[in-house]
Amino acid sequence: MIRKPVVAGQFYPGTKNELEEMINSCIQHKFGPGNQIQNNEGIYGVISPHAGYVYSGPTACYSYKAISSKNPELVIILGPNHFGVGKDVATMVNAQWETPLGLVDVDSEAAKEIANNSKYIEIDEFSHSRDHSLEVQIPMLQSIFSEKFKILPIILRDQSLEMAKDVGNAVAQIAKSRNTMIVASSDFTHYEENSFAHSQDKALIEPILEMDVEKFYSVLMEKRVTACGYGAMASVMIACKNLGAVKGELLSYTTSGDVMGDTSSVVGYGAIKFI
């Protein structure tokens, strides 16, 4: 089956030329990475935001610039299930994801393998039918990688610590046997005043950089940080640590208020790499 885009023309442009122009303008944006060369050796995974490109695209480009020389065969993308449809944790098989930049194959072999290795992951295409969290990452990946790659999409309704440990370990098992990049799709604080969002997210980013998952969940709960993809970030932290990463590095943090000027109610965006 072809998984048609559900937010093309909304979160990002719906035509190839406009989308390519938009991604380039995000790179050159004052909050984007620009053309500087980044040292991207030894990166195991990244965190990237998933809002409309006009808001979070410049920050997302930091994550993608950091992995742009990698050319992986497989990109494992984990993100939250905003609509709560389908299974608690789901991947899919026998599918392609369509964007204005073309089709990307799902790695069905990897999907079956990870579903066997995990207590949580099930194969269910319906879970992926409405959500944008994985979709918005794919055009960015298509634009930076010159070689063909496959994806392993994993969407999370359950974002518990127990799930993250199970799924993180299962992701690492897949990554060990393939040339793989891992992406966690998440925004940070939602709909708070700008300075409060900055302080909340600074507190949550600290344990991410330390790759301390238990502390991450403690801060998340104690401060009630409204990061939507916390389970995706935790799973990727666990997977990357399993693969040999020792720390996270913050590449960029912005809010929609920083980018657009309305600071009364903002969403936070972080670009982080695990090395």
Curated annotation (Swiss-Prot):
Superkingdom of the source species: Archaea
PANTHER family given in the database record: PROTEIN MEMO1 (PTHR11060:SF0)
Family: Belongs to the MEMO1 family.
HAMAP family in alphabetical order: MEMO1 (MF_00055)
Protein name, UniProt field: MEMO1 family protein Nmar_0215
Species in which this protein is naturally found: Nitrosopumilus maritimus (strain SCM1)
